[in-house]
Amino acid sequence: MPELPEVTTTVSGLQKVLPGMTISGLWTDLAKKDQAIKQFKRTIKDEKFFLNFKKKVIGQKIIKVSRRAKNILIDISGEYTILIHLKMTGHLLFGDYYKEKETGKWLPRGNKALADPFNRFVHLVFTLEDKKKNKKFLVFSDARKFGKVTLFRSKEISLIKDLKDLGPEPLEESFTFKVFKDRLALKPRGKIKTVLMNQNIIAGIGNIYSDEMLWQSGINPNSICAKIPDRKLKLLWEAMRQILSKSIILGGDSTSDYRNIKGEKGNFQKHH
């Protein structure tokens, strides 16, 4: 699953190319007419929601792309925000695409990296236009189709279930060692790895980076939080900030499916 560094890499790439572009079209093969799964009801996997989503976003201009934990937030005109969670195998791609008539598949044009086999699972396509009406495409590739795409009024961000209970961002200057200890103290009997991956305790960390930072600081993943000495916790806090920052510089980890918006692999997996 893409974690903080991968989502940051994606957001940084999108922020360079999306603002100012207008959404002129939308396609998906995920929407179901009688969506029975409750967790998909307010996402594009529900046909009724998707049609409303489409109505609200087409014609709107993209203002800004940002991140909160593992969530990608795309602010658009009309005072709405698109929320995308990549889940297990999702990643966003940007470039030139066309829909093949014979197969109905969306295929990249020109960019070899976009033709990477891991980028072929296209299930959502935003058609975009710049001021000169030149078209580009924002594509969501997701092999396992677990990704989440929804929409909310921007002013209601503090009420959104996916966002309102998230813990602090570990790379913010305000995330001091004291704050780190205070967050762990909320789960004193929890196993440290489990607590690190709890998004309500600290935002953005998952399996890959919790393993890396625990290994570097010499802490057993099954250690109980309250029993870890401050000396070790300080090493863990330092490792957390160092490893996450390093992975962002390297473009994230592509041991599995993750690719950046150009369809390229990150390089963190080569350095650990």
PLM-predicted stretches and their roles:
Residues 1-157:
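Acidic, proline/glycine-enriched N-terminal capping motif
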Residues 110-115, 162-171, 223-230:
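Short histidine-centered catalytic/ligand-binding loop motif
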Residues 2, 63, 86, 90-92, ...:
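Flexible, active-site-adjacent loop/turn segments at secondary-structure boundaries
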Residues 144-186:
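A short, charged helix-loop
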Residues 12, 91-93, 97-99, 145, ...:
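Short capping/connector residues at structural and topological boundaries
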Residues 1-4, 116, 170, 174, ...:
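Generic detection of long, well-ordered alpha-helical segments
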Residues 5, 134-141, 165-172, 191-199:
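Short, mixed-charge, low-aromatic patches
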Residues 22-56, 66, 179-272:
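Basic, nucleic-acid-binding surfaces and adjacent catalytic neighborhoods in DNA/RNA-processing proteins
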